[in-house]
Amino acid sequence: MGTIATNPEGITNPPIDELLEKTTSKYALVIFAAKRARQVNAYYSQLGEGLLEYVGPLVETTPQEKPLSIAMREINGGLLTAEPTDQP
């Protein structure tokens, strides 16, 4: 049988209200976190190939932690900034 995590992670940690303070809207937060999660995922994929095109996680991680959770913790920690673009 599985065990229940004592410290839930993901969308509950960091709290969504804290994350929304870091961006202009909830839609911007979704795009921001998704782009960073893709970069983290690509970084892990490239480790075995010796290609390091992307920057790895900026926070301490655990082996089972998902890239989206890592991205949200980086955003909440103020380690990343979102730059508005002129693209639609």
UniProtKB/Swiss-Prot annotation:
InterPro entries attached to this UniProt entry: DNA-dir_RNA_pol_omega, Pol_omega/Rpo6/RPB6, RPB6/omega-like_sf
GO cellular component terms listed in the entry, alphabetical order: DNA-directed RNA polymerase complex
EC category: transferase
Example GO biological process: DNA-templated transcription
Pfam families per record: RNA_pol_Rpb6
Subunit structure: The RNAP catalytic core consists of 2 alpha, 1 beta, 1 beta' and 1 omega subunit. When a sigma factor is associated with the core the holoenzyme is formed, which can initiate transcription.
Name of the protein in its database record: DNA-directed RNA polymerase subunit omega
Organism: Salinispora arenicola (strain CNS-205)
